[in-house]
Amino acid sequence: MKTFKFFTALFATAILTACTLDMERPTNVQYIDKTDVIWQQHLQKIQKIQSYQAKGQIGYISPTERFSSRFEWQYQNPKSYTLKLYSLISKSTLWIQMHQSGMTISDNNGNQQSAANAKLLLQEIIGMDVPLEHLAYWLKGQPAMNADYQVGTNHLLGAFTYHVDGSQWTADYLTYHSNNSMPENILLKNDSTKQTLKIRVDEWIY
């Protein structure tokens, strides 16, 4: 199968940006009880958000990849979502589309590949081992039912630990938008696979 190495070829101009991102987890953070009334009300609110859009910037570091990109995320359900990654400098664009038969990854140069196994396709084409099906919930600050999570003193999700495919992901919610209490800056890390994502959401639509 012929692959197209998107980030190496098209996002080389963004590498220096990713190198400067602060990828360390915050320390000495205070948390409150999960039974907090304001938090429980907020949790019910975000659980009702089934489809939404988010726009912003993502920085990614792994042993083999390092990049920074603008992104647009459109989510309807676990079998229907799109992640658009693009560079304002090079005009390059990548679309990751999940559909009923699997995943399709394409770019603005006409390259396209599809596979039933979304996880393997994402690893092969982009070099990322990120569970996008879980990212849909992590992005809006909704912890999984079986996740070990903490609530911040702002009465919003502060951090969580979640096991996926035998490895452990951690998330720290650094800041929230004041107008809608939706996440603004998120730090995701997987020490097992040595992956780090820094996400900044500039706009929420739901």
Curated annotation (Swiss-Prot):
PROSITE patterns per record: PROKAR_LIPOPROTEIN
Pfam families found in the cross-reference section: LolB (PF03550)
GO biological-process terms attached to the record: lipoprotein localization to outer membrane; protein transport
SUPFAM superfamilies for the chain: Prokaryotic lipoproteins and lipoprotein localization factors
Subunit comment: Monomer.
Membrane-topology descriptor: Lipid-anchor
Lipidated residue numbers (N-palmitoyl cysteine): C19
Signal peptide: 1-18
Residue positions bearing lipid (S-diacylglycerol cysteine): C19
Keyword Amino-acid biosynthesis assigned: no
Keywords attached to this entry: Cell outer membrane, Chaperone, Lipoprotein, Membrane, Palmitate, Protein transport, Signal, Transport
Source organism per UniProt: Haemophilus influenzae (strain PittGG)
Primary localisation category: membrane
CDD domains according to UniProt: LolB
Protein family membership: Belongs to the LolB family.
An example Gene Ontology CC term for this record: cell outer membrane
The keyword Membrane is assigned to this record: yes
Protein name: Outer-membrane lipoprotein LolB
